[in-house]
Amino acid sequence: MGEASRQQRAWNREMTVTTNLSLDIDKYPRDLLRGFMSENGGGRVFHGGETNCDDESTIELNLGLSLGGRFGVDKTPRKLKRSSSVLDTVPFNDSTVAEPENYTVGLERTTSLPAEMEEEWRKRKEMQSLRRMEAKRRRCEKQSFRVGNSDDQTVSFENERWVTASKSGFLQRHLVSSNRQVCGVDSDGGGATGGGSSSSLSELDNKNQQGSSNSCNDERSPKIVAGCSSNSGSQGTERPSVTRANKVNENENEKRVRSEDSVDRKGKGMATSTGLVDMPCVFTKGDGPNGRRVDGILYKYGKGEEVRIMCICHGSFLTPAEFVKHGGGGDVDRPLRHIVVNTSSSTF
C-alpha cells in the first residue's frame, strides 16, 4: 500500500508540472499569426480541436529531452490548421450579388465657361476690338489732318509772300511810272501820245509774256490802258484838265495800295519792321543772249539754313543759282556775286 500511494503521488506531481508547462507554452505560442491575433484581440481562435488533441495525446513519463519546452508530448497527431488571420482576411461568399455601378454618366462641361457667360465674353471681346480699331482710325485721321495742315500752311505762307510782294510798292512803282510817262507824252501832243501809248502797251505786253503776276496785272492794267486810251483820244483837251485827271488817278492808286498794305499787315501780321529790313529787294541781269533783268526778294534765313530768293514775276522760291539761271545767266560758280541788292528801292 505504501508503494502504490508513493507512485500515485509521484504521478500526480508530474501531471501538475506538465500542465503548468503546457499553460506556459500556451502563453507564448510558436505560431506568429496566433501571437499577432492574440495581441490585437481581433482574431478568432479556435481551441476546441486542441483540447481534443491534448486529450488524445499520450504523455510519456520519462526524463528525455523536451521539444519546444514540452516534455513527453507526441506531436505526430497534430495537424496544421488554417490561421485565424486567414479567416479574417478571406471574404465569405455572399449569395446577394451587388449590382455593378453605372459609370456611363453624361459628360459635363468642366473646363469651359457656361454658354451665356461665354457669349457675353465674346461680345465684350468684339466691342474691345471695335473700340481699338476706332481709336486707331481716329489717330490716323489726326495724323493725316496734321500733315495736310502743315502742307497747306507752307503753301498759304508762300502765297501770302507772293501776295505781299505783288501788292508792294515795287510793282506799283513801275506801273505808276509808266502811267506818268504815258500821261506826259499825252500832254505834249496828239501824235506823240499815240506813239507813247503804243510803246507803253507793248512794254506791258512784254512783261506779261515774260511771266509777270497775272493777278496784279489783270486787276490794274485795264485801268491804266483805259486811262491812256482816253488820254490819247482826247487830243483837243486842255493841259490843266489832263494833269488833274492824272493826279486823281495817282491818288486813287496810292490810296488803294496803302489800304491793301494796311489790311494785309493787320490781318496776317506778315509785315514787321525787323522782318522787312531783313528781306531786301534784289535783282540779277543775265549776260547771255537771253539775258534780262529779274527782280526778287531775298527771303529771311537763319544760321545753317539755305538761302532762298522769291521771284517777283512768278512768286516761286529759288536758290541763288536758279535765280541767276532764271535771268538768263547760265551756270556760274558763285551765283551770289551776280545778284545785286537794290538799296534804292523802298521796302514794304
Curated annotation (Swiss-Prot):
Protein keywords: Nucleus
UniProt record, GO biological process: response to abscisic acid; response to water deprivation; signal transduction
Biased composition regions of type Gly residues, renumbered to the chain: 187-197
Pfam families reported for this sequence: EAR (PF07897), NLS_NINJA_AFP (PF16136), TDBD (PF16135)
Subcellular location: Nucleus
Keyword Membrane annotated: no
Subunit structure: Forms a homodimer and heterodimer with AFP1 and AFP3. Interacts with ABI5/DPBF1, DPBF2, AREB3/DPBF3, EEL/DPBF4, ABF1, ABF3/DPBF5 and ABF4/AREB2.
Composition bias type Basic and acidic residues, residue spans: 247-267
This protein's encoding gene: AFP2
Protein name per the record: Ninja-family protein AFP2
Gene Ontology cellular-component annotations: nucleus
Primary location group: nucleus
Polar residues bias spans: 207-216, 228-244
Function: Acts as a negative regulator of abscisic acid (ABA) response during germination through the ubiquitin-mediated proteolysis of ABI5/DPBF1.
Effect of inactivating the gene: Exhibits hypersensitivity to salt, glucose and osmotic stress and slight hypersensitivity to abscisic acid (ABA).
Stretch list, region Disordered: 186-272
Induction summary: Up-regulated by abscisic acid (ABA), glucose and salt.
Family assignment from sequence similarity: Belongs to the Ninja family.
